[in-house]
Amino acid sequence: MFTLKKSLLLLFFLGTINLSLCEQERDADEEERRDDDEMDVEVEKRFLPLFLPKIICAITKKC
């Protein structure tokens, strides 16, 4: 009975450590994805002001 309790306690402990490591990796992956998304937004912000006047000029033909 005592060895069974030790084995179960060891499995629970190792499972808890494994779960916490997986959560840390998942959090790190999510942070990397957020960085890429933020970079895309910055590129879009820089792209739009450069070409918006040219697009409006081409549509209205008032240059």
Swiss-Prot record:
Highest rank taxon of the organism: Eukaryota
Propeptide stretch(es), residue numbers: 23-44
Tissues expressing the protein: Expressed by the skin glands.
One GO term of the biological process aspect: killing of cells of another organism
Organism from which the protein derives: Amolops mantzorum
UniProt similarity note: Belongs to the frog skin active peptide (FSAP) family. Brevinin subfamily.
Keywords: Amphibian defense peptide, Antibiotic, Antimicrobial, Cleavage on pair of basic residues, Cytolysis, Disulfide bond, Fungicide, Hemolysis, Secreted, Signal
Entry's localization field: Secreted
GO cellular component: extracellular region
Disulfide links within the chain: 57-63
Pfam families: Antimicrobial_1, FSAP_sig_propep
Name of the protein in its database record: Jingdongin-1-MT1
Main localization of the protein described in the UniProt heading: secreted
Role noted for this protein: Antimicrobial peptide. Active against some Gram-negative and a variety of Gram-positive bacterial strains. Active against fungus C.glabrata 090902 but not against C.neoformans 201211. Shows hemolytic activity against human erythrocytes.
